[in-house]
């Protein structure tokens, strides 16, 4: 019943994770950094689902639900921070956040 071999699914998850990591390191726009984090979290969730389906265990799907709920919380908090940074500095550049003073 397994349509996707374990190696192929983990390879796709690894490629997605690496793409998210490259986007995280290269981009300076905080919106793109948040999108890269989402890609990385979805890659980890895909790895959980693929590994769980390999051994016919529902644990992968349970972890997927956990990762999706964490991603939703991360996105809402990240977008709130993004809006505050834009209101204060009128830019979405990450380097502007290093100029914040307490």
From Swiss-Prot:
Residue stretches in coiled coil: none
Location within or outside the cell: Cell inner membrane
InterPro entries with a match to the protein in the record: NADH_UbQ_OxRdtase_chain4L/K, NUOK/Mnh_C1-like
A matching Pfam family: Oxidored_q2
The keyword Transport appears for this protein: yes
Keyword list, A-Z: Cell inner membrane, Cell membrane, Membrane, NAD, Quinone, Translocase, Transmembrane, Transmembrane helix, Transport, Ubiquinone
Topological relation to the membrane, as annotated: Multi-pass membrane protein
Similarity comment: Belongs to the complex I subunit 4L family.
NCBIfam families referenced in this protein's UniProt entry, alphabetically: PRK05715.1-1 (NF004319), PRK05715.1-2 (NF004320)
Entries under PANTHER family matching the protein: NADH-UBIQUINONE OXIDOREDUCTASE CHAIN 4L (PTHR11434:SF16), NADH-UBIQUINONE OXIDOREDUCTASE SUBUNIT ND4L (PTHR11434)
Assembly: NDH-1 is composed of 13 different subunits. Subunits NuoA, H, J, K, L, M, N constitute the membrane sector of the complex.
Protein name (Swiss-Prot/TrEMBL): NADH-quinone oxidoreductase subunit K
